[in-house]
UniProtKB/Swiss-Prot annotation:
Residues 420-424 are annotated as: G2. PANTHER family: TR-TYPE G DOMAIN-CONTAINING PROTEIN, TRANSLATION INITIATION FACTOR IF-2-RELATED. This is Translation initiation factor IF-2. One of the essential components for the initiation of protein synthesis. Protects formylmethionyl-tRNA from spontaneous hydrolysis and promotes its binding to the 30S ribosomal subunits. Also involved in the hydrolysis of GTP during the formation of the 70S ribosomal complex. Residues 495-498 are annotated as: G4. Its main location: cytoplasm. GO terms for molecular function: GTP binding; GTPase activity; guanosine tetraphosphate binding; translation initiation factor activity. InterPro entries: DNA-bd_dom_put_sf (IPR009061), EF-G-like_DII (IPR053905), EFTu-like_2 (IPR004161), IF2_assoc_dom_bac (IPR013575), IF2_II (IPR044145), IF2_N (IPR006847), P-loop_NTPase (IPR027417), Small_GTP-bd (IPR005225). GO terms for cellular component: cytosol. PROSITE patterns: G_TR_2, IF2. Residues 72-82 have a biased composition (Polar residues). Residues 46-91, 121-297 are annotated as: Disordered.
Length: 886
């Protein structure tokens, strides 16, 4: 590189030679006009000029900024309840500024001035403190002199008064007075010495405790400081936080904490200790150092509260009433074997056990005070009069219950029932020789257990129909159990006596094994032989019912507000919720306000079992009522009340309580079945949307379908209800991939449109047998297939040949079945499988063939296996899929 002289450099940078020489001189470089300039000299000059214009020179950058980025993913729950991932980027910046030498010098001067000012302030404060102390000492001495002079003056006056009194006293009185004075002075001196000694001991004890506590705190603080420093060394500090700032914050925190503890430590000393410490030579020496603090907390006894527990309560609310943390309640319940969460609803029994376990007194609260008040505020002052018996007809399927009742009512109802089977409860009343009897007909199918149980609870007498040619069947035994559980007398009607070869004694023997003993055998059960087809024995059966009712002496008040029970309920298109009610007491009138389970309403219309409008109904009369707010559950009690507003409040309270109890039961079931739910990914589900004509059918079908569930396939009722199939039901089925089942109901136009567009599976049924069978078939189709291996051929190895292309070729004789080229094989030696694979070649007379039958010779090449020996057996098999059924 060519050298540059001063003149050329001045021309390049656009300045004069004299000015450039002057700048070189200021930078400490001596140059002449014609001398050359090196690169180092140029750098020195540039550095000098940069400093002159406020720069930092070439020592390094004046300011340096460090940036740090960290990215992470945060899971956030949106408004729809679904979790989504959000990218979070954290940026941290720290800036370093380089101080010049001049700034450093100014900083040093400033620090020196501050230090000098601080020393002057300290000296001034010390001087003021000394002056204040001298002033206080002078005031103290003056006060002591004044007190001493006052005491001497008082003593002088007391001596003068005493001498004056002594002059007036007798010698005996004077001696006694002097003795009392000496005794008083001695007692006062002893009291002062005892108080002083006690104060000294207390001061020593406090000093010793303070010293021990100070040592403990010092060791603890030292340990905490070491741990903090260790954490700081291992942790990654924020780049903008300096070490000095962190240390200053730690010192400030420690000072604040110390001040807080000192403030808590200060307590007012007892009056006698103050007095003892303000006397004598130990004056002012009993004050303990205020900078020390103790860490001892006085132990407190557990607070035992009275906890009021309602029927359902959340864990958080229970913890609040016990004045403990929710985590403590959760921990206690875990120890008791219940896995709960803080917001979970638990029942009254569980809450009572937890509260008693934690040592609290439990008060059980009944929240149905309004309900009891409304139900008690009823007029039931009517005189009881004889009423008609309520008779329930029970029996097994197709044993003739409905036919027997039809003959009594002289109306054919059984032919109208689908499949000749009673699908839901029917209630009728008939007149027999001037006496009225109300009959309840119950289904005999196994699915309708709950309906039969409700029928037994609402009845006075049970007629058990048993077919003479069929004998005692499962539902017959169940009916006996229901009647016994309800405490209802039985009348046995042995039906189908018109058939040839029937044996009624067989029925008696079988029922006798169930402890249903006939009257002629010494029991209390009436047996009547009947035929629903010819009418044989029907009059005797009705006579037996009337005789039994006379023995029971059935009475009920006919005047007053009515009460009854819901036999059945349904949703009628055009009329709304319809409930069949059996009146048990009082008179039910049109316009009455009825509280019916979870529903309420004013009766808009009443109809009897024949569909005729009526205005009132007395005891033992079944009626249909319209006007309820919803569909009540079969078996609910129906009660007439005065106030519609209070009836609404009670119904809403019952709905809330039912919801809470149901939620608690579901949560408990979820937790108990936690481990079984872990494997639900392998379980197939058949989703069903079920609609039926009456509530009882919904219960029966849901129960039957749920019982079909197995470990591999489960039936899930995703939706159910009373009434026709609506567009909402079809949409639900489409969303949950369910089949739509209608039992005695049909889909409306909008629902059919959705079903066609979504290509849903819609099925109508009128007999419960068909419904259960078809759902069972659908479940069978979802079972995992089962595979079975079948041996189709067996070949004996007679000789082994070697092939350059394939390897070992087994010359075989087919001894059983067929050897197929495409089938898998096993090689057996001494009846032990030594290889499993497939055929590579199958030839007969050098021709490739597809199969070789029994009794023929062939050559077999086993793929990837050359250890075939004479005497081995080659077994050919195929895998067959077997269709599984439930």
């Amino acid at each position: 590189m060519a050298e540059v002289n001063v003149e050329k450099l001045a021309g390049d940078i656009g300045t004069t030679v004299d000015k450039l020489l002057q700048q070189f001189s200021q930078a400490g470089i001596t140059k002449q006009a014609g001398e050359s300039v090196t690169e180092a000299e140029k750098a020195t000059l540039l550095d000098h000029l940069s400093k002159q214009h406020g720069g930092t020179g070439s020592d390094g950058p004046a300011r340096m900024t460090l940036q740090r980025k960290s990215k992470s993913t945060l899971s956030v729950t949106g408004s729809t309840g679904k979790a989504k991932s959000v990218q979070v980027e954290v940026r941290k910046t720290r800036t370093y500024v380089k101080k010049s030498a001049m700034e450093q010098e100014q900083e040093e001067l400033r620090l020196a001035a501050e230090e000098k000012l601080r020393l002057e302030e300290q000296q001034k404060a010390a001087q003021e403190a000394a002056e204040l102390k001298a002033k206080q000492e002078a005031e103290r001495k003056a006060k002591e002199d004044a007190d001493r002079k006052a005491k001497e003056e008082a003593k002088r006056k007391a001596d003068a008064e005493r001498k004056a009194k002594q002059k007036q006293m007798t010698p005996e009185q004077s001696a006694k007075s002097e003795k009392d004075r000496i005794e008083a002075e001695r007692l006062q001196k002893e009291a002062e010495e005892a108080a002083l000694k006690k104060a000294e001991e207390e001061a020593k004890r406090q000093a010793e405790e303070a010293r021990k506590l100070a040592e403990e705190n010092s060791a603890r603080w030292k340990k905490e400081e070491e741990e903090r420093k260790k954490r700081e060394e291992t942790s990654d500090h924020h780049l903008t936080t300096s070490t000095y700032a962190r240390e200053a914050e730690d010192v400030a925190d420690a000072r604040d904490e110390q001040g807080t503890r000192r403030a808590k430590k200060k307590k007012k000393a007892p009056a006698k200790d103050k007095f003892a410490a303000s006397k004598g030579r130990n004056k002012g020496k009993l004050k303990a150092p205020t900078s020390l603090q103790h860490g001892f907390t006085k132990p407190t006894a557990d607070v035992k509260n009275e906890v009021r527990i309602s029927e359902t309560i959340t864990v958080a609310e229970l913890a609040s009433r016990m004045a403990v943390k929710g985590a403590e309640v959760v921990k206690t319940m875990m120890k008791m074997g219940d896995m709960v969460t803080i917001n979970q609803v638990i029942d009254q029994e569980a809450a009572q056990l937890v509260a008693e376990e934690m040592g609290h007194k439990v008060i059980i609260v009944k929240e149905n005070e309004l309900e009891q008040k409304v139900l008690n505020d009823r007029h039931e002052d009517g005189k009881s009069e004889p009423r008609a018996p309520v008779v329930t007809v029970m029996g097994h399927v197709d044993h003739g219950k409905t036919s027997t009742l039809d003959y009594i009512r002289s109306a054919k109802v059984a032919s109208g029932e689908a499949g000749g089977i009673t699908q839901h409860i029917g209630a009728y009343h008939v007149d027999v020789n001037g006496n009225m009897i109300t009959f309840l007909d119950t289904p005999g199918h196994a699915a309708f257990t709950s309906m039969r149980a409700r029928g037994a609870q609402a009845t006075d007498i049970v007629i058990l129909v048993v077919a003479a040619d069929d004998g005692v069947m499962p539902q017959t035994k169940e009916a006996v159990q229901h009647a016994r559980a309800a405490g209802v007398p039985l009348i046995i009607a042995v039906n189908k006596m018109d058939k040839e070869g029937v044996d009624p004694d067989r029925v008696k023997n079988e029922l006798a094994q169930l402890d249903v003993i006939p009257e002629e055998w010494g029991g209390d059960t009436q047996y009547v032989h009947i035929s629903a087809k010819t009418g044989l024995g029907i009059d005797e059966l009705l006579e037996a019912v009337l005789n039994q009712s006379e023995l029971l002496e059935l009475t009920a008040p006919t005047v007053g507000m009515a009460a009854g029970v819901v036999i059945e309920s349904r949703l009628d298109k055009g009329r709304g919720p319809v409930a069949s009610i059996l009146v048990q007491s009082g008179t039910l009138n049109q316009g009455d306000i009825v509280l019916c389970g979870l529903e309420y309403g004013r009766i808009r219309a009443m109809r009897d079992e024949n569909g005729k409008d009526i205005k009132s109904a007395g005891p033992s009369i079944p009626v249909e009522i319209l006007g309820l707010s919803g569909i009540p559950a079969a078996g609910d009690e129906a009660t007439v009340v005065k106030d519609e507003r209070k009836a609404r409040e009670v119904a809403l309270y019952r709905q809330g309580k039912f919801r809470d109890v149901k939620l608690a039961r579901q949560q408990k079931a979820k937790l108990e079945n936690m481990f079984s739910h872990m494997t639900e990914g392998d379980v197939s589900e058949v989703n069903v949307v079920l609609k039926a004509d009456v509530q009882g059918s919904i219960e029966a079908i849901s129960d039957s379908l749920t019982k079909l569930s197995t470990d591999e396939v489960k039936v899930k009722i995703v939706g159910s209800g009373v009434g026709g199939i609506t567009e909402t039901d079809a949409t639900l089925a489409a969303a949950s991939n369910a089949i739509v089942v209608g039992f005695n109901v049909r889909a409306d136009a909008s629902a059919r449109k959705v079903i066609e567009s979504e290509n849903l599976d819609l099925r109508y049924y009128s007999v419960i047998y068909s419904l259960i069978d078809e759902v069972k078939q659908a479940m069978s189709g979802m079972l995992a297939p089962e595979f079975k291996q079948e041996i189709i051929g067996l070949a004996q190895v007679r000789d082994v040949f070697k092939s350059p292309k394939i390897g070992a070729i087994a010359g075989c004789m087919v001894t059983e079945g067929v050897i197929k080229r495409s089938a898998p094989i096993r090689v057996l030696r001494d009846n032990v499988v030594i290889y499993e694979g497939e055929l590579e070649s199958l030839r007969r007379f050098k021709d490739d063939v597809a199969d070789v039958r029994n009794g023929m010779e062939c050559g077999i090449g086993v793929k990837n296996y050359n250890d075939v020996r004479v005497g081995d057996q080659i077994e050919v098999f195929e895998t067959v899929e077997i269709q599984r059924t439930l």
